[in-house]
């Protein structure tokens, strides 16, 4: 074919943002600005915010005392009511948990020279009873002073499930940290007689069905309780203080 281009067809080169315009379905910057400036559609199916319940150990700042063998506490304690920390329906779902605590040796342990592991568990109870179960009712705690060996007892494994576990290590050097030392002191240096423990757990997915009652104790739960279990190792006595935040929703019928 005669002519300057001999039948070849040439297309104009795309600009700097050509691919971006094509992905957005526009042809120019002007069309993009019009698209951005369009009023947004209202979102009518936005999910409600999570409710928050906070527990303090304790308000007098002394903390809770744990001895060898440990103790169990209900952590899904949601009484019936209209406040944010209350259940509004007969069923709740606990999604998240924030832990900001301190763990310290009891004063009776300062004279010892040793290390003490402290263990924590979040335990789901499918069929709770009238009171909190003891750790020995959940775990095979043959070695009471070595909680790291504990496991859910075989004949109750259909009822209890360990959701989360964590631990920390405390130390004692034989010196009372509350006592002032003089210039002639050349004893052992400081050690971890207390620690901060911070945790945040997601995707717990604990569904709790409640009885028709106003309180939030374990006896008010039909199905699905969540406990916090703490047990010190090495025969230690410890104190645990701080705050726990539970993030949950009220679902089901009122």
Swiss-Prot record:
Coiled coil: none annotated. The keyword DNA-binding applies. A motif (Bipartite nuclear localization signal) lies at residues 9-35. It is found in: Virion; Host nucleus. One of its GO terms (biological process) is symbiont entry into host cell. Gene3D superfamilies: 2.60.120.20. Keywords: Capsid protein, DNA-binding, Host nucleus, T=1 icosahedral capsid protein, Viral penetration into host nucleus, Virion, Virus entry into host cell. One of its GO terms (molecular function) is structural molecule activity. Pfam families: Gemini_coat. It comes from the Viruses. GO terms for cellular component: host cell; host cell nucleus; T=1 icosahedral viral capsid. Belongs to the geminiviridae capsid protein family. Encapsidates the viral genome into characteristic twinned ('geminate') particles. Binds the genomic viral ssDNA and shuttles it into and out of the cell nucleus. Plays a role in protection of the genome from degradation, virus acquisition and transmission by insect vectors, infectivity, and systemic movement. The CP of monopartite geminiviruses is absolutely essential for virus movement. Homomultimer. Interacts with the movement protein. Binds to single-stranded and double-stranded viral DNA. This is Capsid protein. It comes from Tobacco yellow dwarf virus (strain Australia).
């Amino acid at each position: 074919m005669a002519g300057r281009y001999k039948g070849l067809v040439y297309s104009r080169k795309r600009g700097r943002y050509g691919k971006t315009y094509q992905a957005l379905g526009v042809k120019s910057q002007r069309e993009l600005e019009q698209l951005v400036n369009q009023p947004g559609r209202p979102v009518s199916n936005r999910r409600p915010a999570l409710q928050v319940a906070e527990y303090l150990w304790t308000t007098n700042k002394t903390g809770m005392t744990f001895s060898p063998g440990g103790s169990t506490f209900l952590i899904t304690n949601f009484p019936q009511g209209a406040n944010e920390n209350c259940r509004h329906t007969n069923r709740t779902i606990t999604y998240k948990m924030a832990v900001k605590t301190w763990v310290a040796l009891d004063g009776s342990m300062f004279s010892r020279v040793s290390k003490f592991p402290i263990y924590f568990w979040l335990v789901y109870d499918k069929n709770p009873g009238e009171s909190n179960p003891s750790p020995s009712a959940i775990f095979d705690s043959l070695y009471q002073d070595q909680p790291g060996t504990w496991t859910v007892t075989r004949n109750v494994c259909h009822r209890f499930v360990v959701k989360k576990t964590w631990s920390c290590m405390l130390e004692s050097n034989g010196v009372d940290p509350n006592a002032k030392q003089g210039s002639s002191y050349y004893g052992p240096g400081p050690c971890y007689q207390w620690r901060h423990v911070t945790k945040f757990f997601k995707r717990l997915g604990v569904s709790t069905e409640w009885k028709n009652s106003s309180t939030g104790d374990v006896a008010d739960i039909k199905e699905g309780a969540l406990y916090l279990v703490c047990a010190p190792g090495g025969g230690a006595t410890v104190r645990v203080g701080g705050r726990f935040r539970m993030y949950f929703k009220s679902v089901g019928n009122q």
